[in-house]
Curated annotation (Swiss-Prot):
Subunit structure: Part of the 30S ribosomal subunit. Contacts proteins S3 and S10.
Manganese is among the record's keywords: no
GO molecular function, one term: rRNA binding
Gene3D superfamilies: 1.10.287.1480
Name listed for the protein in its UniProt record: Small ribosomal subunit protein uS14
Native source species: Nostoc punctiforme (strain ATCC 29133 / PCC 73102)
Keyword Chloroplast recorded: no
Record function comment: Binds 16S rRNA, required for the assembly of 30S particles and may also be responsible for determining the conformation of the 16S rRNA at the A site.
Keywords, in A-Z order: Ribonucleoprotein, Ribosomal protein, RNA-binding, rRNA-binding
Length: 100
């Protein structure tokens, strides 16, 4: 299980991403449409002024039950270990063990 501080840090990142999403998207659109290099430089500086953790690339998918960061299935939000346990116990409707 991941440390509680890591889980809370990830939650904080998620809140920051949501808070600055509109502003960041507007600046990036302005950056893409800017013609002169000086304008691009100015806009780039504005983007750099935003909090580092407000960038979506810093977000890490984590299991909502254990906080595990690797082997997380997006469809369920669970790590592979928990997914396997719950599937065997029949706690995930529609999930069956494959056989051929």
């Amino acid at each position: 299980m991941a440390k509680k501080s890591m889980i809370e840090r990830e939650k904080k990142r998620t809140r920051l991403i949501e808070k600055y999403a509109d502003k960041r998207e507007a600046l990036l659109e302005e950056f893409r449409s800017a013609a002169s290099p000086l304008d691009k430089l100015e806009i780039h500086r504005k983007i750099q002024q935003l909090p580092r953790n407000s960038a979506p690339t810093r977000h890490r998918n984590r299991c909502w039950l254990t906080g595990r960061s690797r082997g997380v299935y997006r469809d369920f939000g669970l790590s592979r270990n928990v997914l396997r346990e719950w599937a065997h116990e029949g706690l995930l409707p529609g999930v069956v063990k494959s056989s051929w």
